Amino acid sequence: MSYEQEPEDGPYTRWVQSTIQNPRKAYRAMFYVAAIFFIVTTLFPFYWLLVLALTPLARISNMGLVPKGFNPGSFVEMFQLLPFHRYMFNSIAIALTTTVIVLFIGSFAGYAFGRLEFRGRTGLLLLLLAISYFPPAAFILPLFNFFTGNVSVLGVSSPSWFNTPGALVTPFSGLYMPLTIFILTTFYGQIPDGLEDAARVEGATRIGALFRVIMPLSAPGVATAGVLTFISVYNEFFFSFLMTDGQAQHWAPIVWGILNYQGQFQAYYNLMAAASIVGVLPVAVLVVIAQERIVSGLTAGALKE
């Protein structure tokens, strides 16, 4: 009498059976797959920029996933061909100025919306929310006419701010103000009233209590709003393209500098890649320094005690 041997289970079948018995394996596998996918899709563009920057210009047309040649001189040549350091300075200066203005004004607005009771508060918040939904392109025509001196009120023409930092800082401040106000309103509203009352008893005014008590206790929210504003302004190009002529001495930002490596007859892709890598360093350093504040700010801002 012969017995048929049952076929042995394959590795996939055994893994499925073990997963059914222990669901944590499935969750762990899903986590690893998602993490690997996120890491690859996030880091690959930076790797490709590095390959472009290190590949000699003559070999870029035949390049693959690894550099064909090794030419670190691109990181030096990029400063020799254009004053890229000036473009970086322009972006950093405009981003810092906008961030300070947005945080200063947004702090007062956040304090008013988060800690004061007044008629029409909800309506004003909804109005801010509605304004933030407008695309930036909707404001470009009136802003361009205003900043080029083509608007006249009672015979007085608007100032000509074309190719000046004011033409960039002003729209950026208005564009990123609503998000900052919403973040700070949430954080300021969570501070116990007793802490502010104690400062008021000691003789502090409302403004003094805001800067001495409310803002220090809301440091994660302030840092989050500041970093998000800085990064957004640093990377912005739409308004900069229309409000400047692309010259470094006229406050053109970093994206203008990268695009200027593309000439009429030739594009220096290796220099564009090198400039992109150098240009992202200030933002990367800022995020590394403030990452704990950003994470705590983004998570704590969604919770209420």
Name these PLM-found stretches.
Residues 2-13, 28-305:
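A structural signal for multi-pass alpha-helical bundles of membrane permease subunits
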Residues 14-18:
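Short glycine/proline-rich turn/loop motifs
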Residues 21, 25:
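Conserved catalytic/binding loops enriched for acidic/polar residues
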